[in-house]
Amino acid sequence: MGFLPDSWHFYIETLLVALLAYVVMRNRSKRQQEKLSKKLTERQKDELIADWTPEPLVPETPQDHPVLNPKYADGKMTKDVSIDGEKYLNMASTNFLSFIGVKRIEDRAKQTIFKYGVGSCGPRGFYGTVDVHLDLEKELAKFMGCEEAVLYSYGFATVSSAIPAYAKKGDVIFVDEGVNFAIQKGLQASRSRVEYFKHNDMEHLERLLLEQEQRDKKDPKKAKSVRRFIVVEGLYVNYADLCPLPKIIEFKWRFKVRVFIDESWSFGVIGKTGRGVTEHFNVPMEDVDMVMASLENALASTGGFCVGRSYVVGHQRLSGLGYCFSASLPPLLATAASEAISIIDEEPSRVQKVTEMAINGQKKLQDALSGSKFSLQGCPESPMKHIYYNGEDEEKQLDTFVETVFTKNHLLLTRARYLDKDELFKIRPSIRVMFQHDLTEEEIQRAVDAIRVVAHKF
């Protein structure tokens, strides 16, 4: 029993140490409370307030930021625009087919206003459907060679609504890293698993599809409920190049995936008659599950549409959020788009002229930038080109370039700007150069000469 005294001795020492720690902490806490309880004098309060420097609610905006130095254009955004009373050559807008200002389209829009007013008064499913909406859907379906089309009132909402209308949680979507912001928002809303492949890298896409194939073999029961999609752009707005559609269609049949194409930038300008990348690559429309496009670029109207098989498109009338809950497209803009489609059908040479202009313009721009710190990117057929600066402080140098040709040469270009914090992948800063139907050879040469002179000053 000799072990008992030692045991009790240990317990007593532990208790004393704990008691000592409690007393020390209690006294410290008491002193802090007494210190805090002392009232500050008015003078002390004023001194504390004077010493306090609050953090800004938003970061400071640099004085040279474009938002603080806006340029106001008067009148229509045709090839010639008036800014602060002076005339400028416009190579910054997406009016590729020069439909803005066409009297035939304007007259049709005016007639529509006299008949329907300026709005449609509700979403498509709630008294917002007018006969001109149905007419335009039929015309779009016929133009694209599809069974049915569905019309949206806003181009951005078309793409961001169409994707989550089909892809859900548990599905997998294979997406090019270079897709535009509208597609990114649609992917986010779908809650699907997204697998990104390098821009136009078909070997990388094939590896991802093979990996998914192996997952499906390991769990065939789960594989039956997983839907697979490939989402690409016809003409990538961030790169001005085309998707390799034939290879994508090959993967579609090989790996049993559905293919969605955003033709917002290729519709009306790519292909012999402006029907997009399917026409350009001679791919049957039946091989593509759905085509999405905006009416706000080549057709110079507003809104967007999706085309495909009837059972695919019809599903959006109940599941497309932008279709169900947004006010429908104003009738005057629907008839304006209809008239623009009629002109493309009647004058396919309009599309072909823009294509030739883009091809020749690319050669001239490449020659103009040769030997400078600037380079050009874009496929020859694209009426949109990107100019990059190969050096430090890209954004500042590109802004200086745009401002210089604006002030000295009366040439209107635009910097491609992005929401850097929201973009999934960093996009290289660039200047966009747009070609449109009404530009003459002399005007294009004048713009190229101005770009050449400014580019070689850096």
From Swiss-Prot:
| Protein name from the UniProt record | Serine palmitoyltransferase 1
User: Which InterPro entries does this chain map to?
Assistant: Aminotransferase_I/II_large, AON_synthase_class-II, PyrdxlP-dep_Trfase, PyrdxlP-dep_Trfase_major, PyrdxlP-dep_Trfase_small
Which gene name belongs to this protein? sptl-1
SUPFAM superfamilies per the record?
A: PLP-dependent transferases
Reaction(s) the record says it catalyses: L-serine + hexadecanoyl-CoA + H(+) = 3-oxosphinganine + CO2 + CoA
Q: Which cofactors, if any, are listed as required? A: pyridoxal 5'-phosphate
Q: Which family does it belong to?
A: Belongs to the class-II pyridoxal-phosphate-dependent aminotransferase family.
What's a single GO MF annotation on this record?
pyridoxal phosphate binding
> Pfam families of this UniProt entry?
Aminotran_1_2
What role does this protein play?
Component of the serine palmitoyltransferase (SPT) that catalyzes the first committed step in sphingolipid biosynthesis, which is the condensation of an acyl-CoA species and L-serine. The catalytic core is composed of a heterodimer of sptl-1 and sptl-2 or sptl-1 and sptl-3. Required for the specification of abicobasal polarity and development of the gut lumen.
Q: Which UniProt keywords apply?
A: Acyltransferase, Lipid metabolism, Pyridoxal phosphate, Sphingolipid metabolism, Transferase
Which proteins does it associate with, and in what oligomeric form? Answer: Heterodimer of sptl-1/sptl-2 or sptl-1/sptl-3.
**Lineage: superkingdom:** Eukaryota
Q: What pathway does the annotation place this protein in?
A: Lipid metabolism; sphingolipid metabolism
Question: Per the UniProt entry, what is one GO biological process?
Answer: establishment or maintenance of epithelial cell apical/basal polarity
Q: Give the GO cellular component terms, alphabetically.
A: endoplasmic reticulum; membrane
Give the organism the record lists.
Caenorhabditis elegans
EC code = 2.3.1.50
